[in-house]
A protein has these predicted regions:
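Long, hydrophobic, well-ordered secondary-structure blocks that form the structural core
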Residues: 1-21
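C-terminal catalytic domain of Rieske-type non-heme iron oxygenases
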Residues: 21-24, 28-153
């Protein structure tokens, strides 16, 4: 660089960007300032949805929805984690899911909600090795603390 030839001790290791531990799953890369427990969360997801070819999923812009809301992030998470509003807000989803069989499971570091399909509605073909084999699952909704949401439907 012009006029930089007289600078001493640059670059040095302390000039580098910080590095953070990373882990990957199905082509997704995860990191955090002080990550803990992500392996357990990924293990939970692997047992439930690991049979899906997630690493081959492709973005479909036609299915993208963007909503700008003025709310605290905790209120948004609370809304995501409760299914009570589904019959009143999400008409299409309510026609697909059996609200009486909507399930919420807590695991270390996150929450999984499982939407069971009504009779005749689309659902996953779940393999025998899955803990959900035999269920007509239409959707898996994962929330990983503090703010990662993964939806599979």
């Amino acid at each position: 660089m012009p006029e930089f030839d007289l600078v001493e001790g640059f670059p040095a290791a302390e000039d580098d960007l910080r590095t953070f531990p990373t882990t990957s799953w199905k082509g997704l890369i995860f990191t955090g300032l002080q990550p803990s427990g992500m392996e357990a969360c990924l293990g939970e997801m692997e047992s439930r949805v690991g049979w899906m070819p997630i690493e081959k999923f492709e973005y479909d812009n036609s299915r993208n929805r963007c909503y700008e809301i003025r709310a605290n992030w905790a209120l948004y998470v609370d809304n995501y984690l409760e299914g009570f509003h589904i019959p009143f807000v999400h008409n299409d989803l309510n026609r697909t899911l059996d609200y009486d069989d909507y399930r919420t499971e807590i695991f270390d570091g996150g929450v999984l909600q499982i939407g069971i399909a009504r009779d005749g509605e689309p659902s996953f073909e779940i393999p025998e090795e899955s803990p959900d084999f035999g269920l007509e699952v239409a959707a898996y909704y994962y929330w990983i603390y503090p703010g990662l949401m993964l939806n599979f439907y």
